[in-house]
Amino acid sequence: MAYARAVLTTASFALMAGCGLFGSSSDDAKPVATCPTAAILRPLSQTAVFAPGAPTQPVGVAFYGVLSEVTVKCERAGDAVRAALDVVVIGERGPAAQADAMTLQYFVAVTGPDQAILSKRSFPVRVSLPSGAKRGGITDHIEETIPLGGRPPGDLTIVVGFQQTPEAIDFYKHFRGR
């Protein structure tokens, strides 16, 4: 009885070990990405909006904008990808704030494997702050069709950042931000 159990166990292990020999996938095969990677460009993840006539210093900031998160879902469409992006945009009152809403401008760009920009579009987004609140946010949903030009989707990257004004660029040269 013990001998039969040992033979059966050994045969079972041999059978299971052989299962991998006949599989259709190899260790060298990489799964094909259906979606480009999406990322926020950290140097452009924040912006500052100044009150009219205010200095480009912290006391002159009416609102700060922060790109908090981006997610992407894709669907293949021939030699293109239909991408649905959700971009979380946060608005924060600055010392010179006098309103309860702000319009911020961010961009979505597609880059190739060499980081060259293949396409870029800007999107305005209005962020409202409840009365008395320091911060507010919105999830902006956009849909884009990205031509692949024969490339696999995984070779492309979707990058998101604020379109900076000259005042914001000058501000961030001299101050670290919020």
What are these regions (language model features)?
Residues 1-11:
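Bacterial N-terminal signal peptides that target proteins for export
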Residues 56-78:
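Low-complexity, acidic Ser/Thr/Pro/Gly-rich terminal tails and inter-domain linkers that flank the onset
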Residues 28-53:
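Post-signal peptide N-terminal segment of mature Sec-exported envelope proteins
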Residues 20-24:
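Bacterial signal peptide processing site
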Residues 163-173:
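Short acidic/polar inter-strand loop motif in beta-rich domains
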Residues 74-117:
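Mid-length scaffold segments of soluble, non-membrane domains
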Residues 124-156:
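Short, solvent-exposed, Trp/other aromatic-anchored flexible loops in extracytoplasmic proteins
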Residues 15-18:
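C-terminal motif of bacterial Sec signal peptides marking the signal peptidase cleavage site
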